A protein has these predicted regions:
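Active-site-proximal beta-strand elements of phosphoester/diester hydrolases
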Residues: 1-6, 112-136
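Conserved beta strand-loop-helix elements of the APE1-like EEP
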Residues: 57-80, 105, 213-256, 280-281
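Short catalytic/ligand-binding loop motif for oxyanion handling, primarily in non-cytosolic enzymes
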Residues: 9-11, 31-34, 124-128, 173-177, ...
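Short proline/glycine-enriched turn/loop segments at secondary-structure junctions
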Residues: 54, 234-237, 264-269
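Low-complexity, intrinsically disordered Gly/Pro/Thr-rich segments
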Residues: 255-266
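Structured beta-strand-rich core segments of catalytic domains in phosphoester-bond hydrolases
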Residues: 28-124
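Active-site beta-strand/loop signature of hydrolases that rely on acidic residues for catalysis
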Residues: 2-5, 14-36, 116, 149-178, ...
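Metal-dependent phosphoesterases centered on the DNase I-like endonuclease/exonuclease/phosphatase
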Residues: 41-42, 136-247
Length: 282
């Protein structure tokens, strides 16, 4: 599953109650003491960008790959700076607080191992020289850094040569029309285009399943299949409008992967983002 937990404690407690094997988290801090022994967040250098960046005050929440069951083994990739050659257990990272990666080895020997990537496209503020009116900035820059980093696991134009599952909060609105006031549609489209060029298929989540916002939110086409995965402080799960969370998988491997937004009001969870349930069948 994938979930932006907004640096909150209660989502951790909800995680341990689920029958999940692994969680791809975004904006996570350390788990609360009362459940820390029930989750395995792996070595700190797989998620904490301070391991390779000396500016200790830059960030306080992270993407993580968290082991939740003994049905799998997890081999976490250590973050290193943006270098061209890495070790077998390393991933070169170009953004702070944007990515965590690991290899998942199911104990069920019928399911081949695969790589998971937790993605968080942080907002970036334009340079002061732009005199921008954008209040929060842009997220596509972080998304492209993530794509550059995960592309290290791709060494062929044939997508059958890799098994990658990437999911998380990209802070973009899929399929937004050019009049959408909350998006940069032309720039955002380059994210899915580039994923597709790498052989990573878009999985959604899309309706059906998942609850759609009604009426259709401003800035989306009438036939949108988007499902809201995020609500603002002025909204609730019942009034959530926009989908910011997405999943991708290597083409071919994607046929074994299903995704669903757990966005019904009674299953949303204790974050401003809902959970995205991801099931790998083989």
């Amino acid at each position: 599953m994938s979930w932006n937990i907004a640096k909150r404690d209660e989502p951790w407690r909800e995680l341990v109650k689920m029958d999940a094997d692994v969680a791809l988290l975004q904006e996570a801090c350390s788990p609360p003491d009362d459940i820390a022994s029930h989750v395995d967040t792996g070595p700190r250098d797989h998620w904490d960008s301070h391991a390779w960046n000396s500016a200790k005050g830059l960030y306080d929440r992270w993407p993580m790959v968290v082991k939740l069951s003994d049905r799998i083994e997890v081999e976490w990739f250590k973050q290193v700076g943006p270098i061209s050659d890495t070790g077998e257990d390393e991933i070169a990272v170009s953004g702070i607080g944007t990515i965590a990666a690991a290899r998942i080895i199911p104990r069920d020997t019928t399911t081949p191992r695969f790589i998971v990537v937790s993605m968080y496209a942080r907002w970036i503020r334009p340079h002061l020289s732009t005199s921008t009116k954008w209040r929060v900035g842009y997220a596509d820059g972080s998304a492209h850094r993530i794509i550059s980093d995960l592309s290290a696991f791709i060494g062929s134009t044939d997508p059958e040569t890799h098994r990658i599952l990437a999911a998380g909060d990209l802070n973009t609105i899929y399929g937004a029309t050019d009049d959408n006031p909350l998006a940069l549609p032309a720039r955002d489209r380059t994210i899915t285009d580039r994923m597709d060029a790498l052989g990573l298929a878009f999985l959604g989540p899309q309706h059906p399943p998942g609850r759609q916002a009604r009426p259709v939110p401003q800035g989306l086409p009438p036939d949108t299949r988007n499902v809201p995965t995020y609500h603002t402080t002025r909204q609730s799960p019942a009034t959530a409008q926009n989908q910011l969370d997405f999943a991708f998988a290597s083409r071919g491997f994607d046929r074994s992967v299903s995704v669903r937004a757990m966005n019904a009001v009674d299953e949303w969870g204790a974050s401003d983002h809902c959970r995205v349930l991801i099931e790998v069948a083989g």
